[in-house]
Amino acid sequence: MKRDTEISNEVALIWNTANDVLRDIFQRTEYPDIIYPIVLIRRIEGVLIAKTEELKTQLAVQLAKVDAATQTNILNSKLLQEIKFNNISSYTMQKLADEGETSIKSNFISYLNGYTDNIKIIIDRSGIRNHINKLAEEKILFMLIKDFSQIDLSPQKVSNIKMGYVFEELVRKFSEANNAEAGEHYTPREVIDLMTHMLDMDEKAIKKGQLVTIYDPACGSGGMLSAAKEFIEEKINPDAKVVLYGQEVNDKTWAVAQADLLLKGETAYITKGDTLYEDGTAGEQFDFMLSNPPYGKSWKKIQKKVMAASNGRFDIGQPRSSDGQLLFTLHMISKMKPSEMGGSAIAIVHNGSPLFSGDAGGGESEIRKYIIENDWLETIVALPTELFYNTGIATYIWLLRNNKPEKRKGKIQLINAVDFWKPMKRSLGNKRRRIHNGIEGSGENERYVEANDQIKQIINIHKAFEEGPYSKIFDHEDFAFRKVSLDLEETDDNGFPVTILKEIAIASNKLLDIVPAKTTNDKKLLAELTNKKGKDDEYTFVLNPKSELALKHKTADRTITIRKTVIGNKLSFKATITIPKIVKDTEYIPWKANKETFLQKEIEKNWTITAEEKGYEIPFTKHFYIYQPLREQAIVVNEMAELEKENLDLMQQLGIKL
């Protein structure tokens, strides 16, 4: 892959600097807290210096006519107009290094404070100020600044796209070294490209000058947002007005996103905070949304705050507290524009859990039900494993849309793209595979080979919307099922009902229902039974077979003996009856199957339905399973005989006698 070699020099310089300067003074887990901000500051400075030199050339005649102070004012004013920031201190990282170690701490702080407020908030949230004292006390602040002043991260040397890759690779290496958890990773560029293509942006939808809004609720360093904007401007309409929105919970990652988008001159609004309980875009709706939220990550500690700030977003159902990824899906759904206003499209990456976790009536199933029955789920694409940097698990792109074309209404497409990959020339953490974009060679030999473009192949399968080896089309109800709770009557080996004795309490107001007392004798016994002045005793009656008790407990008894207990002036009644032995059972029945026929076929015993719920699950792999028949017995026997002969020959050659 071309970018693997393009970024290796910068990454190696930064990585080696971290190891050389910080080792034995900071814990390895602390390296990113220092290196990320310094990389960020060096990049910001590189953009500032490059723009300043450009302006000096453009304004050479004007600047030559004024003194140095006025020149500085003119340049600072121009910088604010063109790149929205400047630095009024007299320092750069090179000048800090040139002045030596004596005043490095105070000079560095002055340098940081010289930036405009929009950069200072990025620097503050990057966390570097928390480490300045220790860096200075350990005599390594000067070394760090000196080494980084020699690493050229200017736009002329490192393009915006390349800078994103540099940072991505640093995050991957630090995460790998620190055993970061599997869900927290960068999204590979080919996955982002596939997602943006699947959003189905086109010239008809995005007209010249039209405002297009794109949102990522877990935007990380902003890579998806930038890629989506690039896609619109390069492939669809360069004159579209694209506004980016995002939210990120991590201070340092937010700082990277904010800086990256600011340096690119993007119109972007990146809010800081936890999307689930600090909705930074409350009341907003967006045209396109894409995200790769954390999966397999517990939200138990924030559950109360999340539900308190739900504002209806999560009322439909809550997933298990051990995995909150579906909450991001619900959050994005809440940001969809109504279909009559053009609607919205969502592409989101999940692991396998949201496909099937949770029973009928549970949070995950209710969320799937909500999405499917509203006809928002358009497509799910199974991606190759070993595609992400810090995890090799199976992942899926869910495509949701509330403005489906007519042919897709009421339908869901599953695309099995697990085999659409090429091996990496060298592994990047857990990433050993990539979805090929058709670019072959590098440098002057770089060329596009359409036949090798696996992204395009997947997109074509999606657009074709046809059944095939990699594509299956389903109705909504193909993923629905009934969860039926049953009472089964146990039988013995001869098929006769197994009964047990059960003691039950009888309310006094139910006596006449249980005991009709039609005969004179029954009336007499009933009077004695209900006499509060009588003694503890028991009475046998003819049992009303249509009584609530008989029907509820399915007793076959013809009579019932009721025991009377007198406590003061109060009476209590109990009886022991013979009832069938009941076994609890649960059956899961496909929604399209006839319930009665299914139970009659599957259940031999007498059954009674006690509860029924509708659920949804998407057993993706089941629908693409290809049965491999067992080989003929004779072939297997012959192969075993041949192997045995080979073993005997080998043993004879070794001089082993049997």
Show the residue positions of the predicted features.
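Conserved Class I SAM-dependent methyltransferase catalytic core
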Residues: 30-43, 195, 318-400
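Active-site catalytic pocket residues across diverse enzymes, especially alpha/beta-hydrolases
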Residues: 48, 232-236, 336
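Conserved S-adenosyl-L-methionine
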Residues: 181-291, 295-307, 313, 326, ...
